[in-house]
């Protein structure tokens, strides 16, 4: 039997067939529940479950390191990390739910449009950690309490400092169209990576699809995940990256690798990465506990320390050496618009790059 293909359009069509008539922007399911503290009762209930299934697009080493901090904080609860590109995570959850397999407890995705789909389907469990209620700005949390931005990253450029002089490095996306970069560029794919899907939408909106059409003529090395281009550049397999996760480039530089991050002159595409709980979670209390700790000042501070990423928690400062978010020229995201465009973006991108 051929494997069923799941797209955002097909998943939302299922929701409409089940009686979902309102557009996403108009749908208010309920008032957000009050903020909840981590209590001894929650910890005990989580320990009885013993584990949490965490689906994420975080770089695997980061996800595992962060999860181990939680496990050390709450002994007896294991985090089972299921890491893949956000678009693959999205497809996997759809496939599992279509087969009535409810394995995912808790998710963090780099494609914020995903949570709108899951919310529309009625798959998400409203839950607001106390710190989210008190310290997360309204722009970073769902009004119904079903998801919130737990980490913020940027899709940026980078170059290998052994292969490219600082004065010759690209300053922005348009510079990559210079013939001197022919065969020297690596980039990730929006059909795999949520961060790259988000940035592809933003770049196509602001620069036009003609940018990608011209970039495709540069004999670009195509990889899957948004965490891969910085690694390829650091290894010297390509001189520059056309897109990739900023935090991975910074981590590699901190380890002494020959890589330098560039925030594009046109604006760096921002990627809001939300957390969400699933109603059908097999380990609901462990999921609540992990999600709650993730959003505490402690959890958010640890994430900044490990990754150098930004967080939504108002009490947590950026990592040393990183400017305030307000000082960064941002290419804005738009998850609700992306929700309508994602399938078209995948098709058009594949046609342009032939991959």
Please tell me what each predicted stretch does.
Residues 113-117, 239-258:
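A ligand-binding cleft/hinge motif common to bilobed small-molecule-binding domains
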Residues 299-355:
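C-terminal capping/gating helix-and-loop segments adjacent to ligand/active sites or protein-protein/ligand interfaces
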Residues 4-30:
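N-terminal export signals
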Residues 156-163, 201, 271-283, 294, ...:
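A bilobed periplasmic-binding-protein/Venus flytrap-type ligand-binding module shared by bacterial periplasmic
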Residues 56-67, 79-97, 102-230, 234-237:
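Extracytoplasmic ligand-binding site segments that recognize negatively charged/polar headgroups
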Residues 36-47, 51-76, 157:
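Short, polar/charged alpha-helical segment
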Residues 24, 152-153, 181-191, 213-216, 222-223, 255-279, 294-318:
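Periplasmic-binding protein-like
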